[in-house]
Amino acid sequence: MKITPVKALTDNYIWMIQHGNHAVCVDPSEPSPVLEFLVRNRLMLAQTWVTHPHPDHEGGAAALWRGYMESPVYGESDIEAATHTVTAGTQFTFGDGQVTVWATPGHTDRHTSYLLETSDGIHVFCGDTLFSAGCGRVFTGTIEQLYDSFQRFNRLPENTLFYPAHEYTAANLDFAAHIEPDNADIQTALKAAAHTPTLPVTLAHERRVNPFLRVDLPHVRDRAEALSGKTLNSSLDTFVALRELKNQYRTK
């Protein structure tokens, strides 16, 4: 199985998953990059997966379905183009992989992640929940939901690969360095992010550089307290403070 990012809009990635001469597209913000990829690689669209109902994630799903009516569109009931409604725990297959739907709200009150389990491990298509070195903004969800989604991700095996839908890594690492200026892993990742695409990322990597997965560490909590001016009594408090600080932060 081969997984390829296809650039779309300004900073979106539409993830294309190939097995034989069939493909899945994840979060098609627009149809043309997907169609071009399919034609160039002589592939048939087998499935479309949508994580949440924002135009830059579902905008191309209806047009793709009209072109490939035999290919299902998976998404929750608020995804207008969905032909196959999913909920937490829904399972289906693609190629030799098993797909399990997780509810990972926070960015939106209903947000789906798709866990694809293959012989080489777990691949998580996480939309706007987790970004490399960061997390999604809270729109219609709650910060508590987002924290719970991160806690759940953090229980996966460390070699799990995450496939966010945006390339925000450099800006997120800049903020991470603001929180942990002495973290050598963040400095190394910053240098790498300046020269090459950064996705996908392993959970092991994110545990080293993503402040939102490091809220249990005393020095991260202390730094968040110092910058926010608030007393933080729990990991959730630290997560909330970091998200508020990130909202206000301007990349250098």
UniProtKB/Swiss-Prot annotation:
Which Gene3D superfamilies does the record cross-reference, listed alphabetically? Ribonuclease Z/Hydroxyacylglutathione hydrolase-like (3.60.15.10)
Q: Which cofactor does it need?
A: Zn(2+)
Please tell me whether the keyword Zinc is annotated for this protein.
yes
Question: What molecular function terms (GO) are annotated for this protein?
Answer: hydroxyacylglutathione hydrolase activity; metal ion binding
Q: Which residues bind Zn(2+) 1?
A: 52, 54, 107, 128
Record's keyword terms, sorted: Hydrolase, Metal-binding, Zinc
Q: Which Pfam families match?
A: HAGH_C, Lactamase_B
Residues recorded as binding Zn(2+) 2, renumbered to this chain, are: 56-57, 128, 166
What does the protein in this record do?
Answer: Thiolesterase that catalyzes the hydrolysis of S-D-lactoyl-glutathione to form glutathione and D-lactic acid.
| UniProt name for this protein | Hydroxyacylglutathione hydrolase
- Taxonomic lineage per UniProt? Bacteria, Pseudomonadati, Pseudomonadota, Betaproteobacteria, Neisseriales
The gene name reads gloB
